[in-house]
Amino acid sequence: MTLLNQVKTLFQRETVFCVSLVLAVLSALAVRPDAAYLSYPDYRTLALLFCLMLIVAGFRSLGVFERLGRALLRRAGSLRELSIALVLLCFFCSMVITNDVTLITFVPFTLLVFRMIRREGRVLTLVVLETIAANLGSMATPIGNPQNLYLCSAAGLTMAQFARAVLPYAGLSLVLLLAVLLLQRDEPLGEARPEEEGEAAPLSALAPYLLLLALCLLVVFRVVGFVPVLLCVAAVVLAVNRRLFRSVDYFLLLTFLCFFIFIGNLKRIPALNDLLLSLVGGHELLAGILASQVISNVPAAILLSGFTQNFAALLTAVNLGGL
């Protein structure tokens, strides 16, 4: 494969990263690299993202979420109950493992189940509802998606401030999802059920990841520093399952880094800084929603956060705009 083809493939697979890299390089032409560049990144956010990706990979390696889905399935007595269980599973799991990981985990499981009960004609609607549920559920916690994690870390939002910004929307969305599911035509389930795959992971295998997740939550709310937790997570994963390091989305981390450089440089160009402050300040909700529609919610959160102090409004905007 030629270098040009490799670049083309990289751009197709990691479009947001490539765009962020180009923006960072172009901004560096206007603001020459110096020692101030080291102050651009939010190292706390980068460390937390890295740690959480390792922890979620650990949970997935133990089959935790698939087993949870099978347990709910065994208790479902009708198609409506099954659909509600799967949608709620996506909604609540996305609060911890992000919407992308939730969908990667449960959509294939849903397709398998509906093939086994011979209801393939009903699965598309359910997958759409699962996608909506995962996106809406992920907005309800600081670790549910990268933009929440970044804004909570950068702004130092308290749990109360975070809850006021997003929980009313998350709660309303859950009610609407349930209403749609209850209006669906109900049918009895067949006898087919997915079989259990091996023994459940023992609590001793889950314990390290649960403890590490608790430590990350303490970092989010600035109870403990991020450096000791980063070292702790890395050491535990090295000892327990070093292959998990391959599951980290390093391009996402590099995307954050490139946007930090781009925004840091923009703030050092007085004319652009003043213009963006006037456009964003006082208009965080509209600016966040529009930017999320154009460049997606994570870049929008990073970009706009450099030009406002109303982080709660921006948090609401990038979550709603990313739906």
Task: Give the positions of each predicted feature.
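Hydrophobic mid-bilayer segments of alpha-helices in multi-pass membrane transport proteins
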Residues: 2-30, 42-54, 205-216, 223-238, ...
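Juxtamembrane and boundary regions of transmembrane helices in multi-pass small-molecule transporters
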Residues: 2-5, 128, 160-202
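Interfacial loop-to-helix junctions that mark the boundaries of transmembrane helices
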Residues: 6-13, 35-45, 157-169, 198-203, ...
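Small-residue-rich segments of transmembrane alpha-helices in multi-pass membrane proteins
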Residues: 20-26, 49-52, 77-88, 130-141, ...
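Transmembrane helical segments that form the transport core of multi-pass membrane transport proteins
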Residues: 40, 62, 66-69, 211-306
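Membrane-interfacial loop-to-helix junctions in multi-pass transporters
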Residues: 43-45, 74-87, 116-126, 204-207, ...
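Hydrophobic transmembrane alpha-helices that form the pore/transport pathway of multi-pass ion
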Residues: 86-88, 92-139, 150, 302-319
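C-terminal transmembrane helix pair
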Residues: 163-174, 285-323
